Each structure stands twice: as C-alpha cells, then as structure tokens.
Amino acid sequence: MRTLTIFFISLFSLPLVLNAQSVDEMLQKVSAAIEAGQNGQAVSYFRQTIALNIDRTEMYYWTNVDKNSEISSKLATELALAYKENRNYDKAYLFYKELLQKTPNNVDCLEACAEMQVCRGQEKDALRMYEKILQLEADNLAANIFLGNYYYLTAEQEKKKLETDYKKLSSPTKMQYARYRDGLSKL
C-alpha cells in the first residue's frame, strides 16, 4: 500500500515538474525569437507560455521585455486578452493601460480599457473613456451604446426619484406640482 501511495504521488507530481521545465523552455524560446527578430514566432511562443503559466509569463514580461520595443505592445495585448478571458479584469485593465500609454488615441485600446472599467465597476471612468472615443470616432458602436444606455438609466433613476418624492406629498400645492412637472421636463 505504501509503495502504491508513493507511486501515485510521484505520478501526479511529475506533470508539475515537466510543466515548470516547459514554461522555462518556452520563455527561452521567446527570448531567442525576440533576439533573432522573429516577432511573429515570439508572439506565438508567448501565447503558448501564457496557456502554460500566465503568472510566470507576466513576470517575464515585466522583467525581460524592453518596453520601448515594438514587440512589447504585442505581448502586452496577448496578456491583456488572456486576463480578460480568465475574467481577471484588474490585470487586463493594467495591460490595456500599459498599451494606452504608448498610443493614447488608439480607439481599440480605449474601447477595451473602458470595457474593463465597466467590468471592474468603475462606470464613471468608463464614461470618460467612451466620451473620448466618441471625440475620436463619432460612429463607434460600443461607445454609442454604452453612453446611450448610461444616460437613459440615469434619467430613469432621476425620474423615479422625482415621482417618489412627489407621491410622498399627501396634498401637493400647485407650486409643488409645477416643480414636479418642471423636473420631468428637464429629463
């Protein structure tokens, strides 16, 4: 029984050891491809490494990748997409912000960053980003949908508050009714 237990423990721990070695090997391949100028191959290896261990891949990005190189934005995009797919919106937002520092008027990056802000519950920041997107590209569908929904829901909440406050009055005067109607017309 004891040998059987040892056998199973060693059998199940073997993939962890192999995984650690393969992540290091893949990261070495990424470095070699970057040094050789094979950016497409480097991104492919990087994507495979993300699938193996996203945390070590992120550490590699922060420690080994030159942030001024052209490939750094491609690698940051891969990490942002992976974190978004894993629903780690804070880290995805971090990498989209990293991309925005390089190209602050890139509509795609702004849109992805605003989407992450919505997922993180930061609607006010997302609102500002979507407004900036509309300044850059007036017919952006995602920005128009978000802003339309946001302003509509805000107006609905204000209308509900006005109606609730008006209904609290047992016998409203003409002046109170006029204020109520004026408040509704402003919405």
Stretches found by the model and what they are:
Residues I54, E70, P104, A138-D139:
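Short coil turns that delineate tetratricopeptide repeat
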Residues T57-E70, L153-L187:
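Short coil/linker segments at helix-helix boundaries
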Residues Y61-N64, K74, E78, A112, ...:
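Canonical tetratricopeptide repeat
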Residues L18-K74:
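N-terminal leader/linker segments that initiate helical-solenoid repeat arrays
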